[in-house]
Curated annotation (Swiss-Prot):
Pfam families in the record: Aminotran_3 (PF00202)
Reaction catalysis annotation: (S)-4-amino-5-oxopentanoate = 5-aminolevulinate
Annotated positions of the N6-(pyridoxal phosphate)lysine modification: 271
Name of the top EC class for this enzyme: isomerase
Gene coding for it: hemL
NCBIfam families on file: hemL (TIGR00713), PRK00062.1 (NF000818)
Keyword Nucleotide-binding: no
Family: Belongs to the class-III pyridoxal-phosphate-dependent aminotransferase family. HemL subfamily.
Cofactors named for this entry: pyridoxal 5'-phosphate
Statement: the UniProt record of this protein carries the keyword Cytoplasm: yes
GO cellular component, one term: cytoplasm
PROSITE patterns: AA_TRANSFER_CLASS_3 (PS00600)
Name the UniProt record assigns to this protein: Glutamate-1-semialdehyde 2,1-aminomutase
Length: 432
């Protein structure tokens, strides 16, 4: 066991972790859930908080890495899902709920004329890239350093999220023949994109981009950068894919497309849309989407695609994401992130804080964080002191400098104020 000391009673979590390692790799089912000396095990959650098996209560800004926008154990979602459970969980046949949710997505998201449901963000990005390659008959794709588009071979190169946190941004087991078609570019760098396209004329199928890089912290696009990507892809007949698995339905009703006023050809969504259940989707222009089988020849399929449980939860979630939701969650994130920056400044701690609507993160870094190379030079040891300090004070964030924090509709002013008190205590302790 690691010698990191957390000043909380975590005896039951410790025992469960010891047992879990006998059956689960490092005791977890996703790398981002592990932290030293061991993660706490959750017993229950409600609204804005988690409760672990030892009875410790945490204000939650991880929110299951984004999906829990309406708070944990939302009664409307739970009741709707319970009712659907009485009628079946999977049919292998279409349901009306697939149409209902698709129509809601199309109503909200500017690029969405048609939808294909899948089961995760990973499936969505993999299928979107396959679609772009099939349509253009080109193999090469451009992705950005530090961007995480899921755990599939096309894009698991210089990835952010858990891959970067645990020191493996390039995963073994992926053939060079696969990744040789993946061209890396620094985010927010126009010249690099111009040069790559010039050197690979008529060979690039698509550019895939997180409009806000939420898997290497929270890095917003520079002014007009997304507009630049839209223009240069149109000029060169390259398909532009927005990976909106994080930003979709979170930062605006229509995601980053609406927020920044830039419409891609295709987009991928997930997380929030499932209301806590597994889900993903590829959305885009009809002329592109109709190339998926069975209408076209580009194959995409899944036993649980459009399953009625996820459709039910998705419908209930999106109907509650109104103007009040966006103004409230953005306001609470701004209040908290402003305080984080002011408090770090007061204690002479080098930092940069970035906020986009209800997404935010602090980097312990003196330099403006505009891309992966700068982000990975942040003081990760200091970040973990910040993480452990918050945990000891009843606040949970993702245990990585390279993840994002989120607010939900349940993070009221009182909750934010309590969090601010905890942050003040943590920064005092860090600088002692």
């Amino acid at each position: 066991m690691d010698n990191t000391i957390i000043n909380l009673n975590l005896e039951k979590s410790k025992k469960l972790f010891e047992e879990s390692q006998k059956y689960l790799v490092k005791g977890v089912n996703s790398p981002v859930r592990y932290f030293k000396p061991f993660p706490f095990f959750v017993n229950n959650a409600k609204d804005y908080y988690l409760v672990d098996v030892d009875g410790n209560k945490y204000i939650d800004y991880c929110l299951a890495y984004g999906p829990a926008v309406l708070g944990h154990a939302n009664e409307n979602i739970a009741n709707a899902v319970i009712e659907q459970l009485k009628h079946g969980t999977a049919y292998g046949c279409p349901t009306e709920k697939e149409i209902t949710l698709a129509k809601e997505i199309i109503k909200r998201m500017p690029c969405a004329e048609m939808v294909r449901f899948v089961n995760s963000g990973t499936e969505a990005t993999m299928s979107a890239i396959r679609l772009a390659r099939g349509i253009t008959k080109r193999n090469k794709i451009i992705k950005f350093d530090g961007a995480y588009h899921g755990a599939h071979d096309y894009v698991l190169v210089k990835s952010g999220s858990g891959a970067l946190t645990h020191g493996a941004p390039n995963s073994p087991g992926i053939p060079e023949d696969t990744t040789k078609h993946t061209i890396l570019a620094p985010f927010n760098d126009k010249d690099a994109i111009v040069e790559i396209i010039k050197n690979n004329k008529d060979e690039i199928a698509c550019i895939i981009v997180e409009p806000v890089m939420g898997n290497v912290g929270c890095i917003p696009p520079r002014e007009d950068y997304l507009k630049f990507l839209r223009e240069i892809t149109e000029e060169n007949n390259i398909i532009l894919i927005f990976d909106e698995v994080i930003t979709g339905f979170r930062i605006a009703k229509g995601g980053a497309q609406e927020y920044y006023g830039v419409v891609p050809d295709l987009a991928t969504v997930g997380k929030i849309m499932g209301g806590g259940f597994p889900i993903g989707a590829i959305v885009g222009k009809k002329e592109l989407m109709e190339n998926f089988s069975p209408n076209g020849t580009i194959y995409q399929a899944g036993t649980f695609n459009g399953n009625p449980i996820s459709m039910t939860a998705g419908i209930e979630t999106l109907k509650n994401l109104d103007d009040n939701f966006y103004s409230t969650t953005s306001k609470s994130a701004k209040k908290l992130s402003d305080f984080i920056g002011e408090t770090a400044e007061k204690h002479n701690i080098p930092h940069k804080v970035y906020t986009v609507a209800s997404m935010f993160q602090i980097y312990f870094n003196e330099e403006e964080v505009v891309n992966y190379d700068i982000a990975k030079n942040s003081n990760t040891d200091l970040f973990m002191k910040y993480f452990y300090g918050l945990m000891e004070n009843g606040v949970f964030i993702a245990p990585s400098q390279f993840e994002c924090c989120f607010t939900s509709i349940k993070h009221t002013d009182d909750v934010i104020n309590t969090t601010m008190d905890a942050i003040e205590e943590v920064f005092k302790k860090i600088t002692r």
